[in-house]
Amino acid sequence: MEMGKAAAVVLAVNGKRYEAAGVDPSTTLLEFLRTHTPVRGPKLGCGEGGCGACVVLVSKYDPATDEVTEFSASSCLTLLHSVDRCSVTTSEGIGNTKDGYHPVQQRLSGFHASQCGFCTPGMCMSIFSALVKADKAANRPAPPAGFSKLTSSEAEKAVSGNLCRCTGYRPIVDACKSFAADVDLEDLGLNCFWKKGDEPADVSKLPGYNSGDVCTFPDFLKSEMKSSIQQANSAPVPVSDDGWYRPRSIDELHRLFQSSSFDENSVKIVASNTGSGVYKDQDLYDKYIDIKGIPELSVINRNDKGIELGSVVSISKAIEVLSDGNLVFRKIAGHLNKVASPFVRNTATIGGNIVMAQRLPFASDIATILLAAGSTVTIQVASKRLCFTLEEFLQQPPCDSRTLLLSIFIPEWGSNDVTFETFRAAPRPLGNAVSYVNSAFLARTSLDAASKDHLIEDICLAFGAYGADHAIRARKVEDYLKGKTVSSSVILEAVRLLKGSIKPSEGSTHPEYRISLAVSFLFTFLSSLANSLNESAKVSGTNEHSPEKQLKLDINDLPIRSRQEIFFTDAYKPVGKAIKKAGVEIQASGEAVYVDDIPAPKDCLYGAFIYSTHPHAHVKSINFKPSLASQKIITVITAKDIPSGGQNVGYSFPMIGEEALFADPVAEFAGQNIGVVIAQTQKYAYMAAKQAIIEYSTENLQPPILTIEDAIERSSFFQTLPFVAPKPVGDYDKGMSEADHKILSAEVKIESQYFFYMEPQVALAIPDEDNCITIYFSTQLPESTQNVVAKCVGIPFHNVRVITRRVGGGFGGKALKSMHVACACAVAALKLQRPVRMYLDRKTDMIMAGGRHPMKVKYSVGFKSNGKITALHLDLGINGGISPDMSPMIAAPVIGSLKKYNWGNLAFDTKVCKTNVSSKSSMRAPGDAQGSFIAEAIIEHVASALSADTNTIRRKNLHDFESLAVFFGDSAGEASTYSLVTMFDKLASSPEYQHRAEMVEQFNRSNKWKKRGISCVPVTYEVQLRPTPGKVSIMNDGSIAVEVGGVELGQGLWTKVKQMTAFGLGQLCPGGGESLLDKVRVIQADTLSMIQGGVTGGSTTSETSCEAVRKSCVALVESLKPIKENLEAKTGTVEWSALIAQASMASVNLSAHAYWTPDPTFTSYLNYGAGTSEVEIDVLTGATTILRSDLVYDCGQSLNPAVDLGQVEGAFVQGVGFFTNEEYATNSDGLVIHDGTWTYKIPTVDTIPKQFNVELINSARDQKRVLSSKASGEPPLLLASSVHCAMREAIRAARKEFSVCTGPANSAITFQMDVPATMPVVKELCGLDVVERYLESVSAASPTNTAKA
């Protein structure tokens, strides 16, 4: 074969030409952008195509047609060589500080749709790509001025694949919908463009949008491509020095295969590389063959027999082609729209998906639906071209890389007498989630002349993703159904046969649930084949008068609606104004600098953790598999490399304890750091760490303690700190003696939750002169990190400088748990005397993170017949993991939030268990989230025992102020500030709530297989005030620099501090404080500049930082006031700049520092809120849709309503994830196995409430608080338990309908629902066998036993 020198990869990035020669073929586009260009907008959030942080727009030009095609793509999966001669546009390319911001960026900013900002550039590009696609659609009418051709529904779906952990998505959705021509602008939420309620919403007030403003494919690249066409056509096969091969025909591909330099282990065949997001490469390949350039693989042929799709046709293109077809094709297209996410579908290929399904245990939706549609495949093996049915292809032994899938043919079925349906059950309705089970059914029917019933002539039943190697056809069921008319007895027998055919393999999760899903799907399909509508209603459970019939809508397609009610105050302006977040535009453009965006210093090295996979074992040795990656290792840092005088410490906190940095000599939990691989690039470090071979020994070691039960049995506990230990209330025994009824030893379990900050743990350590070191670090604890790093490497604190500018999300996970990264970088940097950077891959981050505390609770409660509770006792078991972290303090908030109700008398026994798992940490609302849920579980249980309305029991047991003071002491504050009862009554006692509750009852009476529930919960949250420093410095030009102890995590701290600074100095300005806002800059946290910075956490850092700044401003005003008065006497009005110039000349100190400490009589206060949620569950699948949530939250006098609203919504949605969907699963050794976006599902835009209403109330002023404000960061998370409680109500309705009496209570209405209530949990509580039992009852009730289904 003729070999030619490789041509360099040429591409345009934001209009600028880049050329890359000799680049490693495994280099991704994201890696190239971040290391070879100034671009920093695309971020590495997951490396799996599952988060959207890396989304870019790729534009391809066809010189033959002179057309440019554009699509969004996940740059973390896209290989650099695959975008040769393409143009790439990032968030910086559509708008930036220099050239001005794009309307997408401006609207995201103005709708308050960015908090930490790490996800925002990817959001921008997903929206921008959707706009480009819609505006190029020729078949759509021109939109009104200022709008695009997008519809509201399309605008929401544009970001369906993008994750955001901060905002709760509602403001992002509003920004998206602002571009839609069919939107009612009055429905959009709080923004900076018009004042809601006071000014009319008008598109002219929005940043103007015109399609085509951004050039996505530069002319210079078009010219180069045109000039190279002839040369390319006559050139030999491009065989490159860098290992990237682009055959232009199948013959060329086979010549490559026949070359002696190719073997199975060294070559990877790629079309889009999206498969690497599913099956992460354990090593690097040295040769890649890109088959996308083979024209035959891109064919799309359509005739009267069907549609042929080439194997490298993208899923998005397939959707486009199939959407313009018959019923079967359109149904396939609709299902494909729920596979992956838009930016993955744009590049992922139909053939690649099917080949993965054939080779690997891949849960493919595409294989299942194409199997049901009777598809065939054409493959080529060597010179042989073969055609198989898809079923035959899937059943063959896994094909090797030399077997080439050429095309897939989907036959034309027509529409007459053909019924085709597809099904999937997944945690997210719009895709970006693997199915628990998928299925597709095709039936051809005819009319039976004698009975006039529909007769099944032929049928295909395909099932996939249920735990088998590949999708299958249920042949026995098909054979049984052929020739039959559908009746309840026929369906019942088909279901029984199916249960014998669907057999999840050993080790599959939720096997009984998966079988039940398959039954549900078959039942639903066969029911639709019933001839009589009335008889069909017996199965579907609907009737013409039901709300379900009246609202014949797919609730997952409803545009998200919202309402915000906010009271604004001008008492302290600009404090109290809803100004947009500081720095939000540069977050949207991608110019905001996070730690990994700092350019790599000269000679920088990169690290990756090697972690234990054993929960308790001696580490005997570390070796590496022979591989390309292991050849790149420079060294491995372990405990022996800690400098003399240093200590093996990864974190430490006063009075609590510490955790080792390295396992030495025993690994005490699966996921513990054993060593750090150091390599020349981050990719090589990642890959080498995966190649580590650890030799373990368990000789002379006890078995690991992994569960709360294990710890209690072996008495393995941490001691609760006495000064934070919760205190009992009253006399429990006396309270129980007064009770009319008792519930004894009931149990509830709560599992863990992962933080899922969008920015993984990251640090950059740079050694400096005189044994000093500077660490750029993403942390909530700069000061503590400084202290721990110094202790670890054995140097004075003043030799360690920790700098934190902004953090891409924290939620408690960037507190103690993050310090290991900084310490590891410091040890390596000082040993090697070179900068060392670590950026954890998402899997390692998730395995080491620990997360929220799992708990097991046993409770006994006594209560009166009227529902008044007289006594409660808890046995509380808390899994703290291997080291203390914050666990010794966790019992206090658990009991504290539980105290929202007046239990009469409260006693408890808490055990914080020490176990061989990663230490658990403080995650947003730590302990409080669990405690508030426990309280609701008990209230629900009492209500069930009394057959009483749950809200009546809640209201009966809410505190009056006197009992509140008994339970909370000084934290209760003044009676005038107790707003909980008012808020609860506002929701639960309103006529609207009563009407909605009646509608829910009506819906449930009318619908058998869908049930609704509604619930209202109160919350109380105690926060602690902590000392905080602040410093305000006025420059000679009048600009102002502010430093505070708190760190900007996305919570709006900088924004509130800016407002407080302007307020504090405003009395010196003619225009008041508002005129100073643009002059204030809050600068990064720096431990050598601002000492005693403390902790950014606990929800109060913003307000305490503001108060420290206000006190600094008071000092400055005192200094400047005499000068101002003197100038006013001479000249009248004094401008700010003149005042500062004069003060500088007079040598006035223009910098003031304050260290605010709380009043000893007021160190804590209570926050209150109430939330109502209405949900709908699918009894057949366990899926839950949140129809509506109404939140009322007491924000005091809000320092910034836009910021506080964002905190309320974001916390609530994070809580929804905790209570419903986030399953942080581990294996039998305690090693996290839900370790990426593929398996761990946080909420997305399609899982938030369809109607999302928030009211911020301003409670009575309290001058003890900072300008009467209140915290908003954590308390609202507790309101998400309203969703869990509403789900319980819906499940109760289903259990009553089907007489399901599972659980210890053996009751339909009394049952325990643990956290999280995932789809399998919901379905199991509704009854895994409800379909069979229902069919049995219908069959038995039918006189002829052949009732039509």
UniProtKB/Swiss-Prot annotation:
Enzyme class label: oxidoreductase
EC number(s) given by UniProt: 1.2.3.7
Cofactor: [2Fe-2S] cluster; FAD; Mo-molybdopterin
Positions that bind [2Fe-2S] cluster: C46, C51, C54
Complex and partners: Aldehyde oxidases (AO) are homodimers and heterodimers of AO subunits.
Family: Belongs to the xanthine dehydrogenase family.
Domain of life assignment: Eukaryota
Reactions catalysed according to its record: indole-3-acetaldehyde + O2 + H2O = (indol-3-yl)acetate + H2O2 + H(+)
Protein name: Indole-3-acetaldehyde oxidase
Entry note: cofactor: Binds 2 [2Fe-2S] clusters.
